[in-house]
Amino acid sequence: MSSQANLATDWRAGYGPIAHRSETIERMQALVHRLVAQRRIADEASAHALLAAADRVACTAMSVVAHMTYARRIDRSGRPLGSDDFKQTPEGHTGGSLDMVPAFVGYLLANALTGTTRGWLMGQGHCVAAIEAVNALTGDVSAAQRGRYDRSEAGLSRLIADFYSYAIDKQGRPAVPLGSHAGPNTAGAISEGGYLGFAGLQYVHTPLPGESLVAFLSDGAFEEQRGSDWAPRWWRAEDCGFAVPIMILNGRRIEQRTQIVQEGGAAWLAEDLRHNGFDPVIIDGRDPVAIAWAIVESEDTLSAFAAQSNRRYPVKFPYVIAETEKGFGFPGAATNAAHNLPLDGNPREHAQAREAFNAGAAALFVPEIELENALTVLANHGKNRRSRESEHPMARRHPASPHLPVPAWAPTKVSGSAMSSLDRWFVKLAQANPQLRVRIGNPDELASNKMGATLALLKHRVNVPEPGVPESTHGSVITALNEEAVAAAALANKGGLNLIVSYEAFAVKMLGLIRQEIIFARRQKELGQPPGWISIPLVVTSHTWENSKNEQSHQD
C-alpha cells in the first residue's frame, strides 16, 4: 500500500483478533495530526504505517506466547502442528502474557511514533513470555540471548523449547537464558516483578528528570498491595521524570474475578482513582494503538504541567486503565483456566485441544514478508537517533561514586548515640553530593530514631507544608505509615542517594520488597553484569538490647 489513504485504511482495519474501536481511531487520528504539526513525526503516512505494523507484530508475538506454553517448536509457514510438536507438560502464565503483548507492543509503538525511547517496568513479572517473544521478534535481546533467540523459525523454536524447560548446567544454575519471571537476561528489565504490587509503589520514584517510564501494573496487585494510590503525592516536575502507569485490567486472578471487577469494573476503579488524585482514562487494552495513544497523551499532560511557571501540587496524575480479558486473542480467553493453561487439555494428547490450538494460531498468523515489513517499519531507532528499548537509561544505572565525607570519629571511652553519629554524617553526605537525588524511606519515625538533623535538612515531602514542621513541597523524605511504600521510594531511586530507617519489627514488612531487589541484583552479578547503583543502607532500631520502651511491640 503506497498511498496515504490506503495506509490509513490498512491500520483502521486491524489484524487478526485486534480490532480498533471508533473511539480509538478518533483519538489516534487526532494525535497523529498533532504529532505531524509539532514535527515529531514526518507525516501521516509514516504514522499510519507504524500503526498497521504494530497490529502485525502483536499478533505474531501472541502466537509465539501461546507456542511458548504448549509447543516444542513453531512453523512460520503457518502449517498446523502435530501431536509430537507439543510439550509433554505445558506450562506458562499464558493469559496474562497474552494480555501483556498488545501493551508492550503499544509501548514500542509510542516510542516509534514520537522518536523517543522510554523505559519500562512490569509489575506482573510472571508475564515475561510477552516481553521475550516481542524482543526475539524485534531482535532486541540481551547479550546472553544473542545468537540463540531471533525471529527465524529456528530462533523462535529455541525460545519456545527453552521456556519452562527447567534445564540446569553442571554448576546447578539455569542452563538457558530464559526464566519464569523477568530477570537480567530479559533485555530492558529492571525488576523481577515476582511481587505484583511493588511496581505500583516504585514507578513514580524511578525516572530522573529528562527520563520517561511506562509502568505496566496488575489489577490483582490493586488488592494485594496498598500505597500505589500515593503517586500524585510524591511526583514533582522539578526532580522526577515522567511516569505513565498502565493497569492491565483483565479482571481475573488465579481462581476468580478480581475485586475491581466484582465491585464494578473499570468505571468503579476510575472513580476510586479520582478520589486519590489521579486523572484516569479507560482504553481498549486489546489494542496496541490504544496503548500507544494513552502513553503519549499521558506524557504530554505531565509535560504541559511541568512547563507551567505557577505549578501547584498535587498534579492530577495520568492513569491508564487498559480494559481487556484474560488470555485475549486465544481459545479459552476470559476463563479462570486462561491464567495458566487456557486450553481444555494437552494438545499433545487430546485432538480437540490440538485443533483449538492450531485454530488459535491460525487466527494470529502473519505471513513472513508482511511481518518483516512491519518490524522494519517499527525499527526507526537509527532514523530518530534513539537507543533500543533494552538500552533505556533506567536499565543502565551507573551514577558516579558519591563523595564520602570523613566521619567525625568520637573519642574512645566516650558514650554516645550511634544514630546521632549517623545523622550528622548523612547530613554531610547529602550536602557533599548535590548532584544525586536523595530519597529517605521513613515510616514516620525519623526524628524518634535520632535523625533530626537529616529531617531538618531534607524535610518531609508534602503537598502543603505545615508551618513550624520540617515539611516541604520538594522534600526528600518520603514519609507514610506503610513500610513497603517508603522503602520503595529509596529502592527505586537507583540514580541517586538513599537511606531507609525503621524500627526493627516494622522493617520486617519491607523484606519482600528487599528480597526481590536482592534476587535481581544477585542474578546480575552471576551473569557478569553487576548493578551500578549506589548501595542502599537499611537501618533498623529499637532492638531488644537497646531499650524496652515499647517492649516487643517494636522489636523482633
Each predicted region: which residue ranges?
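Flexible, low-complexity linker and terminal segments
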Residues: 2-48, 281-289, 295-438, 445
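Non-catalytic terminal/interface segments that mediate subunit docking, oligomerization
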Residues: 52, 66-74, 120, 375-532
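Structured core elements
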Residues: 121, 282, 319-321, 439-442, ...
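Short internal beta-strands
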Residues: 121-123, 241-251, 441, 538-540
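Thiamine diphosphate
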Residues: 170-244, 293, 448-556
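Glycine-rich ThDP/TPP pyrophosphate-binding loop and its adjacent helix/strand module
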Residues: 179-372, 546-556
